């Protein structure tokens, strides 16, 4: 439901910030036009970034074709996905918490970095890291299989940007401490 509202509001959005023009936007455009990952010959300012965001955006643009609104929608879905953990344990008696949590998320995300209409990766890394830690706290540490499922979002963190490496290391250490203690 929320992505539909986002699409209705931001379907005509265009790049605004420097990094969207210098590399984040170029990555997805090159992937859509060549149907492969970018190489060292890319026009982007930083050809060595991992392909996580652009790969996700590419999958969104496969069927309808390239549209910057679709790219922003893909980025928004990537941004809110780890936040779904906040709604996981809400029961019927707590339904009034949903608007309150959504308001806090809207306030936090709109003031976090460049907001929700941005191709930047830094706020995506922060939200995924927070989502992984929250899911680790919410999971049952006595069940290593459940904790092991967090390896998938940890891999996403590595695919987004190189800054994910120390975050993954600290999250693994945190999850290990949860298992031990």
List the predicted regions and their residue ranges:
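Aromatic-anchored segments of alpha-helical transmembrane domains
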Residues: 4-7, 104-110, 155-159
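Active-site lumenal/periplasmic loops and adjacent helix-entry segments of GT-C-fold
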Residues: 6-95, 118
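Hydrophobic, membrane-inserted alpha-helices
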Residues: 57-58, 106-110, 131-133, 149-154, ...
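Multi-pass, polyprenyl lipid-linked donor-dependent membrane glycosyltransferases
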Residues: 73-78, 100-105, 111-136
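Membrane-interface helix-loop-helix junctions at transmembrane boundaries of multi-pass membrane enzymes
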Residues: 87-99, 143-144, 181
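Membrane-interface transmembrane helices that cradle and orient dolichyl/undecaprenyl
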Residues: 91-93, 129-146
């Amino acid at each position: 439901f929320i992505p539909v509202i986002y699409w209705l509001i931001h379907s005509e959005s265009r790049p605004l910030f420097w990094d969207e023009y210098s590399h984040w936007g170029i990555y997805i455009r090159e992937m859509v036009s060549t149907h492969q990952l970018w190489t060292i010959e890319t026009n982007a300012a930083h050809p060595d970034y991992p392909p996580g965001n652009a790969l996700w955006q590419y999958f969104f643009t496969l069927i309808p074709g390239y549209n910057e609104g679709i790219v922003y929608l893909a980025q928004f879905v990537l941004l809110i996905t780890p936040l779904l953990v906040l709604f996981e344990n809400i029961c019927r008696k707590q339904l009034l918490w949903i608007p309150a949590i959504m308001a806090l998320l809207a306030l936090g995300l709109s003031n976090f970095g460049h907001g929700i209409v941005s191709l930047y990766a830094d706020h995506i890394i922060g939200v995924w890291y927070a989502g992984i830690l929250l899911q680790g706290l919410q999971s049952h540490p006595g069940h290593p299989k459940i904790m092991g499922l967090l390896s998938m979002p940890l891999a996403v963190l590595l695919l987004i940007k190189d800054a994910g490496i120390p975050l993954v290391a600290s999250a693994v250490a945190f999850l290990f401490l949860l298992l031990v203690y």
